[in-house]
């Protein structure tokens, strides 16, 4: 298999280091590099050191394909690790799989990350966005006593997964979306979408959004006096949301697939890891 020699295993990772998820992409790159350094300090994997190469997609599927072509054909990676973005991952599959390159633990909860075809080369860890929205939406709607559930979603494979999950979840409690509205990937103005949901009288909004767009949607809503309950997925929330969005983000709910490493309340193993991260990079994870 390519990417494996007697002394080294070459891995690749495509992150968003210049687009709407750049802050998160930087954290992901540093976190993965920290773990690779730990493994190498302990002698590697079966005596082989890990060599992790990063490329930047800017959260653009076309750039992701170019990055994958470089990593697969030039750098000869054994596996793609932690590639971020649903559409970006799907776009790179035709580059990876003909060369038997594994797609390992992508940073997306799309079902395409583990379903056929080529499922033997797909290793996913996240609860699917569809199931996050399908289970989380009816539970929180009932808990909040919401009467008009609505959705704003990114107009791509990721956003549609969240939308479908929300719709199917609401069916289980005899409801349907009162309104839905979408935005193009990379958008920064959400005034028309917020106005549409406000006019519909939505008191509950499912967010098929990523980090920057989560902040933008909620900030615009607060500015116009629109204050429904907001529910996002794992893609909608990291601690960057409240760090960058401030008090306006109070009251946001999100489904999570892993424990967020808050230093003051995480489990002991996570606190241990988080403190190592802070020591190495001089910032909270």
What is each of the regions a protein language model found here?
Residues 33, 37-44, 69-77, 93-101, ...:
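Sec-exported extracytoplasmic/periplasmic mature domains
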Residues 1-13, 41-50, 141-147:
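Immediate post-signal peptide segment of exported/extracytoplasmic ligand-binding proteins
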Residues 62, 76-181, 229-254:
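Extracytoplasmic ligand/sensor domains, especially the bilobed periplasmic-binding protein
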Residues 26-33, 134, 159-167, 267, ...:
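Short, surface-exposed alpha-helical segments at coil->helix boundaries
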Residues 10, 23-30, 42-115, 183-190, ...:
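Beta-alpha junction/loop-to-helix N-cap segments that form part of ligand/metal-binding clefts
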Residues 127, 218-285:
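Extracellular/periplasmic periplasmic-binding protein-like sensory domains
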Residues 1-33, 55-62, 84-85, 152-160, ...:
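Extracytoplasmic "Venus flytrap"
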């Amino acid at each position: 298999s390519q990417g494996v020699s007697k002394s080294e295993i070459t891995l690749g990772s495509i992150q968003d280091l210049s687009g709407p998820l750049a802050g998160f992409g930087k954290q992901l790159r540093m976190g993965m590099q920290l773990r690779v350094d730990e493994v190498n300090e302990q002698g590697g994997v079966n005596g082989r050191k890990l060599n992790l190469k990063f490329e930047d997609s800017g959260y653009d599927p076309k750039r992701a394909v170019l990055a994958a072509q470089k990593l697969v054909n030039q750098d000869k990676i054994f596996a793609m690790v932690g590639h971020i973005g649903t559409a970006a991952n799907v776009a790179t599959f035709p580059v990876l799989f003909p060369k038997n390159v594994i797609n390992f633990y992508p940073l997306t909860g799309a079902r395409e990350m583990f379903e056929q075809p080529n499922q033997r080369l797909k290793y996913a860890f996240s609860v699917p966005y569809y199931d996050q929205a399908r289970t989380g939406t009816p539970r929180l709607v009932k808990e909040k006593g919401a009467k008009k559930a609505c959705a704003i979603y990114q107009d791509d494979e990721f956003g549609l997964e969240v939308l479908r999950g929300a719709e199917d979840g609401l069916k289980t409690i005899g409801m349907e979306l009162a309104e839905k509205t979408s935005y193009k990937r990379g958008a920064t103005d959400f005034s028309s979408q917020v106005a549409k949901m406000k006019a519909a009288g939505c008191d509950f909004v499912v967010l098929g959004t990523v980090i920057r767009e989560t902040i933008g949607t909620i900030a615009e809503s607060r500015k116009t006096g629109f204050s429904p309950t907001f529910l996002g997925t794992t893609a909608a929330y990291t601690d960057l949301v409240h760090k960058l969005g401030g008090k306006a983000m109070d009251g946001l709910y999100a489904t999570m697939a892993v424990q967020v490493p808050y230093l003051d309340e995480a489990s002991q193993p996570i606190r241990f890891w988080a403190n190592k991260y802070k020591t190495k990079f001089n910032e909270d994870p």
